[in-house]
Amino acid sequence: MDSVTIAWAALMAISTFSLSLVVRGRSGL
């Protein structure tokens, strides 16, 4: 795999994880 592909995949994963955490936190509170 290319390093750029890995970096892009990691960025997408972190963004999705952060977004889900924010939504879950707001709905939870």
Curated annotation (Swiss-Prot):
What GO molecular function terms would the record report?
electron transporter, transferring electrons within cytochrome b6/f complex of photosystem II activity
Q: Name one GO cellular component term.
A: cytochrome b6f complex
Q: Organism's domain of life? A: Eukaryota
Sorted alphabetically, the keyword list is: Chloroplast, Electron transport, Membrane, Photosynthesis, Plastid, Thylakoid, Transmembrane, Transmembrane helix, Transport
Give any Pfam family that matches.
Answer: PetN
Protein's cellular compartments: Plastid, Chloroplast thylakoid membrane
| Membrane topology designation | Single-pass membrane protein
Would you kindly state one Gene Ontology biological process term found in this protein's UniProt entry?
photosynthesis
Q: What is its main location?
A: plastid
Subunit-level organization: The 4 large subunits of the cytochrome b6-f complex are cytochrome b6, subunit IV (17 kDa polypeptide, PetD), cytochrome f and the Rieske protein, while the 4 small subunits are PetG, PetL, PetM and PetN. The complex functions as a dimer.
Reported function? Component of the cytochrome b6-f complex, which mediates electron transfer between photosystem II (PSII) and photosystem I (PSI), cyclic electron flow around PSI, and state transitions.
Supply the HAMAP family for this chain: Cytb6_f_PetN (MF_00395)
The family classification in the record reads: Belongs to the PetN family.
Name the chain's protein: Cytochrome b6-f complex subunit 8
Q: Which organism is it from?
A: Adiantum capillus-veneris (Maidenhair fern)
